[in-house]
């Protein structure tokens, strides 16, 4: 657990969470002096949080550990509109039943990070005030504080103008700003936290409170979880890396972190574990074969936070058992691949590297469930590699290869 610094701002800064802040000096001062109620919103687009939400949950957890009160806001109302930020198309519309089911699932996962006992944190759902909103009153009360010109200049809308932005989605920013307004009135919430892709929406909430009520309001964004090449982390051969063990097993989850790029280890240890920063820096400074020890620590710590100590230990032991008989991934023969290989079928790459003699040999292995990548069976004979499908390739029972990018 992080040693108690006087101010959580310094902890967040040192660990690399902070990206953009509305009033940096004021925020640092109030976080050091007051108990702040803050919120982060989660739209229920699926019945599980994924690794992209993980960093926001850690952001909340650090704030709570330093005496501040989190509100985890489930978007049961905004989820019916869909956030256009970072999207080139319109989200599929979900039914009320789907949204409510997803909200319940997400609430359970949040309790792994946040202590909701004795009013230490609040679980709220914006469906409570958005679904039965009086449209005319809302327009008169809130709409007058928004400039359409300024809204259209926001990055989240600008990128959508060419492909078409629906009026439904155009309302999202105002709805999110209204959430902040309501949470301020109900719980004296004065700060919003969120991913950096939410910056435009968050500024709207801060400005609404400051204009309408002449009250102090603040926003901080956290960095998005990207690898050393700037690509979003958390994708596997199966798709997203989920926090639900039914969707991504603890073993698969452990393996993902065990096999990340060397350059990403220190950043992930800082953002996704509670290890002291001295230890994070020590592990991050390890080189060559030694960095694998740091990856084991990362995989264990992250899996422990999400799935508990027992599942983390099981995943660690399963990995050691798999590689225990001389099949250690660090010592396994490497298959070095380039960007050019990502457009080829895996079987063609294996024939090129003389790992298998013919494609028909590879097809037979796949048909007999004898080929897996990071413990996931390959079922498609036309399977192609990409940045997120590197790691342990197993052919039959005894052949192991470490697929790495050259």
UniProtKB/Swiss-Prot annotation:
Q: How does it assemble?
A: Homodimer.
The protein's matches in Gene3D superfamilies, at most eight in alphabetical order, are given as: HUPs (3.40.50.620), RNA-binding S4 domain (3.10.290.10), Tyrosyl-Transfer RNA Synthetase (1.10.240.10)
Leader peptide range in chain numbering: none
Return the EC number: 6.1.1.1
Q: Which gene specifies this protein's sequence?
A: tyrS
> Would you identify the family this protein belongs to, as annotated?
Belongs to the class-I aminoacyl-tRNA synthetase family. TyrS type 1 subfamily.
Please indicate the residue ranges that the annotation assigns to the motif 'HIGH' region.
Answer: 44-53
Listed under catalytic activity are:
tRNA(Tyr) + L-tyrosine + ATP = L-tyrosyl-tRNA(Tyr) + AMP + diphosphate + H(+)
What does the record give as the function of this protein? Catalyzes the attachment of tyrosine to tRNA(Tyr) in a two-step reaction: tyrosine is first activated by ATP to form Tyr-AMP and then transferred to the acceptor end of tRNA(Tyr).
Lineage, opening ranks: Bacteria, Fusobacteriati, Fusobacteriota, Fusobacteriia, Fusobacteriales
GO MF, one term, reads: ATP binding
> Could you say which residues bind ATP here?
235
User: Motif span ('KMSKS' region)?
Assistant: 232-236
Q: Per the UniProt entry, what are the Gene Ontology biological process annotations, in alphabetical order?
A: tRNA aminoacylation; tyrosyl-tRNA aminoacylation
Q: Which InterPro entries does UniProt cross-reference here?
A: aa-tRNA-synth_I_CS, aa-tRNA-synth_Ic, Rossmann-like_a/b/a_fold, S4_RNA-bd_sf, SYY-like_C, Tyr-tRNA-ligase, Tyr-tRNA-ligase_bac-type, Tyr-tRNA-ligase_bac_1
Family annotation (CDD domains): S4, TyrRS_core
Q: Keywords assigned by UniProt?
A: Aminoacyl-tRNA synthetase, ATP-binding, Cytoplasm, Ligase, Nucleotide-binding, Protein biosynthesis, RNA-binding
Report the GO terms under cellular component.
cytosol
- Protein's UniProt name: Tyrosine--tRNA ligase
What is the enzyme's class at the highest EC level?
ligase
- Pfam families according to UniProt: SYY_C-terminal, tRNA-synt_1b
- Show where the S4 RNA-binding domain sits: 344-404
The protein's location, in the record's own words, is:
Cytoplasm
Q: Which residues take part in binding L-tyrosine? A: 39, 172, 176
């Amino acid at each position: 657990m992080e040693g108690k610094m006087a101010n959580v701002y310094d902890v967040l800064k040192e660990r690399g969470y902070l990206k953009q802040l509305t009033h940096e000096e004021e925020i640092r001062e109030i976080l050091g002096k007051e108990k702040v109620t803050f919120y982060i919103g989660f739209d229920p687009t699926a019945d599980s949080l994924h690794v992209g939400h993980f960093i926001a949950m850690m952001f909340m957890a650090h704030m709570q550990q330093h005496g501040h009160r989190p509100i985890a806001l489930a978007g049961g109302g905004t989820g019916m509109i869909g956030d256009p930020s970072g999207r080139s198309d319109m989200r599929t519309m979900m039914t009320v039943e789907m949204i409510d089911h997803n909200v319940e699932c997400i609430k359970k996962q949040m309790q792994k990070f946040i202590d909701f006992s004795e009013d230490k944190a609040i679980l709220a759902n914006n469906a409570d005030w958005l679904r039965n909103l009086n449209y005319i009153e809302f327009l008169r009360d809130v709409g007058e504080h928004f400039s359409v010109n300024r809204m259209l200049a926001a990055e989240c809308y600008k990128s959508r103008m060419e492909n078409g932005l629906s009026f439904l989605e155009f309302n999202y920013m105002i709805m999110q700003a209204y959430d902040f307004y309501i949470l301020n009135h109900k719980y004296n919430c004065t700060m919003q936290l969120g991913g950096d892709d939410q910056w435009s929406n968050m500024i709207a909430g801060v400005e609404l409170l400051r204009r309408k009520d002449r009250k102090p309001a603040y926003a901080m964004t956290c960095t998005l979880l990207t690898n050393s090449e700037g690509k979003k982390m958390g994708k596997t051969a199966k798709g997203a890396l989920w926090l639900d063990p039914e969707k991504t097993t603890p073993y698969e989850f452990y393996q993902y972190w065990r096999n990340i790029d060397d350059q990403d280890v220190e950043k992930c240890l800082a953002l996704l574990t509670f290890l002291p920063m001295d230890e994070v820096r020590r592990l991050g400074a390890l080189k060559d074969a030694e960095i694998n020890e740091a990856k084991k620590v990362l995989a264990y710590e992250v899996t422990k936070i999400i799935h508990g100590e027992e599942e983390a230990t099981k995943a660690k032991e399963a990995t050691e058992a798999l590689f225990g008989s001389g099949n250690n991934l660090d010592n396994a023969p490497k298959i070095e691949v380039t960007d050019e290989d990502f457009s080829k079928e895996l079987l063609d790459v294996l024939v090129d590297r003389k790992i298998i003699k013919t494609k028909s040999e590879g097809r037979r292995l796949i048909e007999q469930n004898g080929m897996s990548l990071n413990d996931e069976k390959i079922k498609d004979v036309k399977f192609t590699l990409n940045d997120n499908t590197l790691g342990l390739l197993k052919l039959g029972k005894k052949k192991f290869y470490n697929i790495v990018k050259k």
